[in-house]
Structure formats: structure tokens, C-alpha cells
Amino acid sequence: MAAQGAAAAVAAGTSGVAGEGEPGPGENAAAEGTAPSPGRVSPPTPARGEPEVTVEIGETYLCRRPDSTWHSAEVIQSRVNDQEGREEFYVHYVGFNRRLDEWVDKNRLALTKTVKDAVQKNSEKYLSELAEQPERKITRNQKRKHDEINHVQKTYAEMDPTTAALEKEHEAITKVKYVDKIHIGNYEIDAWYFSPFPEDYGKQPKLWLCEYCLKYMKYEKSYRFHLGQCQWRQPPGKEIYRKSNISVYEVDGKDHKIYCQNLCLLAKLFLDHKTLYFDVEPFVFYILTEVDRQGAHIVGYFSKEKESPDGNNVACILTLPPYQRRGYGKFLIAFSYELSKLESTVGSPEKPLSDLGKLSYRSYWSWVLLEILRDFRGTLSIKDLSQMTSITQNDIISTLQSLNMVKYWKGQHVICVTPKLVEEHLKSAQYKKPPITVDSVCLKWAPPKHKQVKLSKK
């Protein structure tokens, strides 16, 4: 175990809550009022002996996605899957988030004229039907929400020059996602992004992970043997929260380096933009688990810097895919703010957030602020809201702007709200009360001693 994590690059940077009620990576949620997706067709079987074009790396072909729609896809890499005994191609769907990149069999590529013609005919029919529909204008805010939910990737032209340059460099380094699946606990999960597992581990189509110690293995046989030997039944560190079957452990990266490295490698499979570190010592990790007779099963986590010069209360945050859409993402967000309240500070997640992270944080902030505004009577400033919630003033302003509840007047932001407007927002499913909330009575935690000294001097 000790040798395994020593050389591993680890992820402990950009935040990315993965999914509270948003479409998953394989879903194609259509915007309200749009026509069916183009290319949804069952193509005819190619004629016997019909020639196929040769698949070339870097070329673009029509590829059938898991939802049976056809889309242009660039072939990035090829490999022979030793576990399956077949040739596969790694494709990126043009215009889609790289989360949807995947390894596909040759038979999912339109390589014959018969198949290509069938897809083209269906696409032309779709465009004809679309042209007959009345024009539907959408606002910039609606377009932004649609792009976030449907994983629409920004083009380099839409980015500022610095961001575009960094994005190109990041894409070149993490272009191919070799680890396609992982098995952890009772779940087999499709990976979303590249993760820098060391040596041959990073080139395996599938890895097996122990859900307790997070050791990763190349072979199922090794995994089964390890399960019989592993003594762990919960994360290392200290349990700081327990209510019913929900438990949270605080793990210091300095004290449990290998575990935290393995956790970050696991997280990187589901988070795109990450700053990679070889050293996890500057971070503390908060592991959310579901507890049963077998042990404490990892659900998700967030990390935070022990000393954040930017005032961030979260460095990285993730709910594992099998546990998404059950309220755990917002629970982790709420938990991070409970810690900030005990530290008597305000905090914000490290930027940039992933698309799903933006949706989850914005939904959480909105719910918290709406609950306060609904019950409060009297005068309330943005500074007051920040002190009550530990949410930064900038995050509060941007959230209230999205709710049309703040105006800029005489050089400052002023809250403009009516009880009716608050109630209308609270009726929306987007801003409803999270299914799992943090019970502060069950939180057994105090700031580190050096932070307590700083607080006493304020």
C-alpha cells in the first residue's frame, strides 16, 4: 500500500460538485421547446462486402452515442483492450463537454457509405422540421443555464486569451481518458475524465478500488484477495459528525498521505479542471460516508487548505456518481459553511467551479438566502447576510442578481425584495429545501488551536 501512492500525482485544487438533480454524463437533456435530437436513427446494415474507410487518428467521423444519436466525433487515440480482446477508439464529441469522451468499438463509427447516408438523410429531415418551427428567442441567462445543464463546451473564441491558452495546455495533457471504468464497493462506475494513476495503472481500461482504504488494483483477483485481508472499515482520521447513518470524518493530509493521494486520484476521474499536487499535506479532507453493519461507505468529500490566502473554505468537492441527486452535494456544501461559522469567517469555494458545481452552489446559496429573507422583518444588508451565513458578499450579490433581488443604486448594491417574489422562488424545485441538512448539534468540531488564537485576537 505504501509504495502505491508514493509517486502518484494527486488532485486537490479546483472545486467541482458533481450533480444534485442535473442530467448525468450520458444524458442529453433537451431545452424546452426544441425539436428532437438530430441523427437518432437505426441505420441499415451495410451491404455485404461494402468497403469501410480506415479509421485515422485526428480525423472526424459520425459516432453513435449511448443514447443512439449520431454526432461528429474526433478520434483521439486507439488501443487494444486486453481485458475485452478488441480494438477501441477514444473519441471526443465535437461541441460537447469532455466528460462525454469515451472509448468505443469500431461498429459505433459510421465507416460505410450506407450508414453515413442514412444518418445524413435523418439529419436533413431534422433540419427541415426545425426550420418550420416558429423562431424562439432565448435570453443570455437562459442560454447560460441551457449550456450548463447540457454540458455545452465553450469554444476557444468565447474565452479570453489567457483562459484559452491555459485550456489548450490542460486539454493536451489530459486528452485521453485511459481508465474507462472503476469498481468500488458495490458499484461499477464510468470514469468522466483523465486521472494520472502511476505506471501501468493509468493505462488500464478498468481499475478495482477498495472502498475503505482506497487502494487501487489492476486485476479483480488482486481486489478479491485484498478484500479478505483489509482491516479498514472506515476512513482514517477522526469522526466529527454522526446522525443516523450519515457520518463525516476529518482526515489530515499530513497524517494519512497515501489515503488522501488515492482519494484525489479517484476524484480526478470525475473532475476536469484540477491543480495536481504531489503533496497533500497542506490540505484537510472531510469524508462523507453512509454507515451500515459492514462499515462506513464513502459517498463524497471536500478538501480545504489549512491556510487559504484567498479565504477559500473548499478546495475540491465531489459526490461520487452513484450517490448523486440524493442531496449529498448540498450537504457537503452546507457542512463547509458550518465549519466556517465555527471559525467566525466567511468563505467561498475555489474557482473556477465545474458546470455542475456552479449549479449546486447557486442552488444552495439561493435556498439559504431565500429562507432568511422569507422570515426576516426589518432592514437587512448584504453584509448582515454574509455574517449570518458565512457566504461571501460577492457570492451573495451574484446569487441575488440571478434571483432579480438586488439593484445597484447610488454606488452600492441594495436588496429589493417582496414576500411574493420570495415565495415564488421557494416554490421552484430548484430552490427547495435539501433532503439532507446538517444538524449542528451533531457536529463535534472546533477550529485548530492556532486559528483559535487568531480568533481571540480579533
Curated annotation (Swiss-Prot):
Residues 1-15, 25-36 have a biased composition (Low complexity). The modification Phosphoserine is found at S37, S42, S348. Its EC number is 2.3.1.48, 2.3.1.-. Propanoyl-CoA binds at I317, T319, R325, G329, K330, S354, S363. Acetyl-CoA binds at I317, T319, R325, R326, G327, G329, K330, S354, S363, Y408, K432. The modification N6-acetyllysine is found at K113, K274. Pfam families: MOZ_SAS (PF01853), Tudor-knot (PF11717), zf-MYST (PF17772). This is Histone acetyltransferase KAT8. It comes from Homo sapiens. The gene is KAT8.
